[in-house]
Structure formats: structure tokens, C-alpha cells
């Protein structure tokens, strides 16, 4: 380690630099790998009895998406409970969580040497660094004192990042990369590092701690309910109820009672007083999924609640005050529903004070790989397998697929592949290859053809300026529709200043 003293000095200096947390973590792991000559290392956040990878070096890409319950991984549990450096003997019978996941050509090799560095702040565990090598003697020459220095630097780096995020949350200037305060136990973790997910996280953080109504839009299976849960958990109402109601599953005959409640004797079968969803969500949040399926009659009654903040149970003349925040979701384009007369314009404007668009999985790039790891670990636990590894060929296949069913489809595909692999082998170490995935390989050009602006091959009769204007106008119109007719979101998607976009749109006669 003496030869790389300058690198450790740089790690210390990084703590006060303007580096992003991601870059700081990656530099830390790179320095560890160079210093210890290990084959892989990982920085993990500890929260609610789970270790979540924040950065890795030398491991498969899907590891970042995995969440490791210490109850399922004896080595990680040993690190969490040790309070000091943990050196696992080369003949340890405890399975390593990274067996088969180290980026190495000889996949049959398993990890032979492993060190765990618990990261402690004021004697509280906040994370860990794991260091793995194939050579069983690789770490013998390094003293515990040297390893404790690494542990202290890593703990300070992670603690600084957590403090910065907390301060940004308090000031309302949350970073787009906010992802540390996450927990598999509360069901609101959103896996992803793509630009589309960063924008989604930024929008959630911007509006969560307000009282504004939110309209969540996006295709089926993209995770709109997850976004609603995140909005609630990050709000001042987080300690109160989040009440869910699927409007599409409501028969017309019981819909009003479900929303507003009824009194005894209000109708046949009303044998007692009953609260509706609005009362159940009083001082909390009501999530109305598939809001576009509500009848026009119920839309009118919902609008009244939003306007006056009170409800009437069926059969009761009294008004009951409620303090309920509304989050609605739909896979329909409600502006079109308004034009068609199927949705009230006044209710639409009340609900869409702050619209949030959830991107489809096909637009999220490498997030597919992270989600594959996340669902693979869930399948491993369900099947009681020792490990699940996805081959590089399978990862390529999954990334090339267009995912019309989005995240929900991906979860089912991974679960099915794991079951097939388990049925075909007696080995508890499962390997998922392309043959286990019942999806067709798609060409990148075919996958994206629907999103391209196609120009007919005809004789050119326009000058360059006219052709450029036409292209820009088409692109702006297309993006504007994709962003639910929101100019600010359109500007972000096109990476333009909002003012510049408005001026360009006026010049192209796209707006007055």
C-alpha cells in the first residue's frame, strides 16, 4: 500500500470535492482494487437488515440491482454483526453472495478469499465494503490496521454522501441521483440510474412534500403505484394512511359507497355505517388508480370533494370534512378523453396540477440490467437457490427486447426463467441462459422504429432552412405529446432551456 499513498490522499481529498457520490464511490473501489490486487469489490449501504450495492468494481452489472437480506446471506450477516474487520478463511463453508457474479472468463471458479469491512459511524452500522479474490492467499500480507484505514475512509465517504443527501432533501434541492435512503421493506424503492429515472426521481422530490394533487401517467406495468407510494412516503403525511382504490375494479353499483361511505339503511344490504376511502385517508393520501375509468357521475362528486373538502355518505344529509391528498394514475391520455367527452375538463385540471410521466422500460437503457439483478435475487429467495447468475448472452437478449408489458413483464419473465432453470438441474447454483427466456430477440432498429420520425424518400424540393424547420417542428410536436402536453417536461426531454423552447415553438407556429 505504500506505493499508492498518493491515491489514498486523493480519496481523502475527494470528501470535500465537488465530485458526485457515484464518482467518489467508484474511485474509492478502484483504489481498493489497485491496492489489494483483488478481483472484485463492492460498497454496500445497510438499511432495514438489507445490504444494497451503491457501487461495484469487477462484478457483473446486474449486482447493483440486487438487494441482499442479511438473513439470507451468512457472510454479510457476519460482517454486519462483527464491528471490525472480518477475514473469511479460504475453506469457509459460508456461501459468498458474489459466487458466479465476478466478471471473469472462468465462471466455474468460486471466490476463495474474502474480507468484509463494516462501515461504522458513532458505532452505528451504515454500510460495508466487501473485497473478494480467487487467490486464497491474496490478502495475507495486509494488516488489519491497513484495512481499518480503508474502512474509515469508506465510512466517511458514505456518511458524507448520506449527510449531503439529507441536507438537499431539507433544502428542497434534491439531487436527481437520490437513491441512498432506500429499503426493500417499505416497497417504494425504485431501481434505476437512467436519465429518465433521474428525471422521474427529481419530479417526485419536487412535489412530494407539497399538498398539490398529482396525476401519474404511463403505460401499463411501468410502476405507477410505486411512484404513488414514493410520493406519500416522502411527504409530510408519511405517518398517516395511504389508501389505494382501483377505479377500474369498481362496479358502478358500489363505487359511490367505496369512495364516500354509507349509513345504515341507506340501501338494501347496508346493515351498518361504513366509512369510505376518503374518510379512511383523512390526513393521509388517497391513491385513485385507473382514474380514467370513473363514470361521469362519480367524476362530478369527486370534483366537489376537491373543491370543498367535504363528503356526504350515502343516505346522510350531513357533510363530513376531510383533509385528503389525492394522487391519481391512468394509462390513458386524459386530455383526449376530455375532448371525447369521457372525462370532465374541470376535474382533469384539478387532478393534473402536477403531472408525472413514468417512462416505459424500453426508454430506460441499462436499468433493465439492474432490474434483472433485483428480480433474480427475489427469485433466488423464493426458490431457496444458493445463487442465480444470468449469462452475458441472456443480459444482451433482455436489453434488446422492447418490453411491451414493462417492469411487470420483466419480473414474470425472470421468475419463469428461474423456475425453468431449477427444473432442468439438480444444482442449487442456477444459471439463466437465453434458452430460459421465452422472448424473441429483437433488432435495435426494429425496436426503435415506432419512435423514429420517418421522412418519405421523395425528390427534395425544400431548402435546408425549411427542411430543418420541418424536422424541428415534427420532433417538438412528437415530444410534446409524449410528455403529456407539458412544455417544461418537453424542454427537459429535448435538453433545451424552457424559454428557448417557447421561442422556438412560436417561430415554428406551434404555439401563439
Swiss-Prot record:
Domain Sigma-54 factor interaction: 190-419
Binding annotation for ATP: 218-225, 281-290
GO molecular function, one term: ATP hydrolysis activity
Pathway noted in the entry: Nitrogen metabolism; nitric oxide reduction
GO biological process, one term: phosphorelay signal transduction system
Keyword Hydrolase: no
Pfam families to which the protein is assigned, alphabetical: GAF, Sigma54_activat
This protein's UniProt keywords: ATP-binding, DNA-binding, Nucleotide-binding, Transcription, Transcription regulation
Residue spans binding DNA: 487-506
InterPro entries xrefs: AAA+_ATPase (IPR003593), GAF (IPR003018), GAF-like_dom_sf (IPR029016), Homeodomain-like_sf (IPR009057), NorR (IPR023944), P-loop_NTPase (IPR027417), Sigma_54_int (IPR002078), Sigma_54_int_dom_ATP-bd_1 (IPR025662)
Membrane-crossing segments per the record: none
Biological function: Required for the expression of anaerobic nitric oxide (NO) reductase, acts as a transcriptional activator for at least the norVW operon. Activation also requires sigma-54.
Protein name according to UniProt: Anaerobic nitric oxide reductase transcription regulator NorR
Lineage of origin: Bacteria, Pseudomonadati, Pseudomonadota, Gammaproteobacteria, Vibrionales
Gene from which this protein is expressed: norR
Amino acid at each position: 500500500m505504500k506505493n499508492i499513498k498518493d491515491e489514498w490522499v486523493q480519496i481523502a481529498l475527494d470528501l470535500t470535492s465537488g465530485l458526485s457520490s457515484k464518482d467518489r464511490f467508484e474511485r474509492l473501489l478502484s483504489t481498493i482494487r489497485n491496492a489489494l490486487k483483488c478481483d472484485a469489490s463492492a460498497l454496500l449501504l445497510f438499511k432495514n437488515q438489507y445490504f444494497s450495492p451503491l457501487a461495484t468494481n469487477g462484478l457483473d452489472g446486474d449486482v447493483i440491482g440486487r438487494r441482499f437480506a442479511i438473513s439470507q446471506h451468512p457472510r454479510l450477516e457476519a460482517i454486519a454483526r462483527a464491528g471490525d474487520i472480518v477475514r473469511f478463511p479460504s475453506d469457509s463453508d459460508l456461501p459468498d453472495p458474489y459466487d458466479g457474479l465476478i466478471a471473469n472468463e472462468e465462471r466455474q471458479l468460486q471466490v476463495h478469499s474474502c474480507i468484509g469491512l463494516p462501515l461504522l459511524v458513532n458505532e452505528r452500522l451504515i454500510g460495508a465494503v466487501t473485497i473478494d479474490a480467487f487467490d486464497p492467499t491474496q490478502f495475507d500480507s495486509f494488516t488489519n490496521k491497513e484495512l481499518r484505514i480503508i474502512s474509515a475512509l469508506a465510512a466517511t465517504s458514505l456518511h458524507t454522501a448520506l449527510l449531503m443527501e439529507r441536507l438537499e432533501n431539507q433544502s428542497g434541492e434534491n439531487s436527481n441521483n437520490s437513491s441512498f435512503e432506500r429499503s426493500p421493506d417499505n416497497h417504494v424503492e425504485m431501481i434505476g440510474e437512467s436519465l429518465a429515472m433521474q428525471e422521474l426521481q427529481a419530479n417526485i422530490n419536487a412535489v412530494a412534500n407539497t399538498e398539490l394533487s398529482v396525476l401519474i401517467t404511463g403505460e401499463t406495468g411501468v410502476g405507477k403505484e410505486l411512484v404513488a407510494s414514493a410520493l406519500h412516503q416522502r411527504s409530510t403525511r408519511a405517518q398517516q394512511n395511504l389508501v389505494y382504490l382501483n377505479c377500474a375494479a369498481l362496479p358502478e353499483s358500489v363505487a359511490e359507497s367505496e369512495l364516500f361511505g354509507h349509513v345504515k339503511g341507506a340501501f338494501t344490504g347496508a346493515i351498518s355505517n361504513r366509512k369510505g376511502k376518503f374518510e379512511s385517508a383523512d390526513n393521509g393520501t388517497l391513491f385513485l388508480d385507473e382514474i380514467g375509468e370513473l363514470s361521469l357521475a362519480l367524476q362530478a362528486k369527486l370534483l366537489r370533494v376537491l373543491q370543498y373538502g367535504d363528503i356526504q355518505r350515502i343516505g346522510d344529509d350531513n357533510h363530513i370534512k376531510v383533509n385528503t391528498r389525492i394522487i391519481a394514475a391512468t394509462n390513458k391520455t386524459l386530455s383526449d378523453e376530455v375532448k371525447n367527452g369521457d372525462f370532465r375538463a374541470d376535474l382533469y385540471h384539478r387532478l393534473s396540477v402536477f403531472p408525472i410521466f413514468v417512462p416505459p422500460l424500453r426508454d430506460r437503457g441499462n436499468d433493465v440490467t439492474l432490474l434483472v439483478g433485483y428480480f433474480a435475487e427475489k427469485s433466488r429467495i423464493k426458490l431457496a437457490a444458493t445463487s442465480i447468475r444470468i449469462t452475458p448472452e441472456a443480459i444482451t437478449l433482455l436489453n434488446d427486447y422492447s418490453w411491451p408489458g414493462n417492469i411487470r413483464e420483466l419480473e414474470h419473465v425472470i421468475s419463469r426463467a428461474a423456475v425453468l432453470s431449477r427444473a432442468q438441474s439438480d444444482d442449487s447454483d442456477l444459471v439463466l441462459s437465453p434458452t430460459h427466456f421465452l422472448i424473441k430477440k429483437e433488432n435495435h432498429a426494429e425496436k426503435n422504429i415506432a419512435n423514429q420520425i420517418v421522412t418519405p424518400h421523395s425528390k427534395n424540393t425544400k431548402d435546408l432552412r425549411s427542411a430543418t424547420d420541418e424536422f424541428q417542428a415534427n420532433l417538438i410536436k412528437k415530444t410534446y405529446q409524449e410528455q403529456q402536453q407539458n412544455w417544461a417536461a418537453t424542454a427537459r426531454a429535448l435538453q433545451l432551456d424552457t424559454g428557448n423552447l417557447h421561442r422556438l415553438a412560436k417561430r415554428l407556429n406551434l404555439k401563439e
